[in-house]
Amino acid sequence: LAAVSVDCSEYPKPTCTMEYRPLCGSDNKTYGNKCNFCNAVVESNGTLTLSHFGKC
């Protein structure tokens, strides 16, 4: 099984769009899109990872 990952190098960003493309984080929380997820990754100091694409 290939590891899924998202490039968060351009984050954090001050604002995210309302686009809905859900991602499931390793904290078992569904993030609305990559921007919301990546901002959370940055805030977690890299401890948050992507579990899978789609809702948890």
From Swiss-Prot:
CDD domains named among the record's database cross-references: KAZAL_FS
Keyword Repeat among record annotations: yes
Annotated Kazal-like domain residues: 6-56
Cysteine-cysteine disulfides: C8-C38, C16-C35, C24-C56
Glycosylation sites: N45
Protein location: Secreted
Matches recorded under Pfam families: Kazal_1
Site residues (Reactive bond 3), renumbered to this chain: M18, E19
Highest taxon above the source species: Eukaryota
GO cellular component: extracellular space
Comment, domains: Avian ovomucoid consists of three homologous, tandem Kazal family inhibitory domains.
Protein name: Ovomucoid
Annotated organism of origin: Lophura bulweri (Bulwer's pheasant)
Organism classification: Eukaryota, Metazoa, Chordata, Craniata, Vertebrata
